[in-house]
UniProtKB/Swiss-Prot annotation:
It comes from the Bacteria. The keyword Ribonucleoprotein applies. Belongs to the bacterial ribosomal protein bL34 family. This is Large ribosomal subunit protein bL34. Keywords: Ribonucleoprotein, Ribosomal protein. GO terms for cellular component: ribonucleoprotein complex; ribosome. GO terms for molecular function: structural constituent of ribosome. The keyword Calcium does not apply. Pfam families: Ribosomal_L34. GO terms for biological process: translation.
Amino acid sequence: MSKRTFQPNNRKRAKTHGFRLRMRTRAGRAILSARRAKGRQKLSA
């Protein structure tokens, strides 16, 4: 049997998809502004 692919880990999640990471690059900031424009409750993980 192969293991499940999703092994939840909050620290890994934040480091890969977190707000600080999004703010780091221009593209990431574009993602955040798009999500703000759409009216998302959560901007990032």
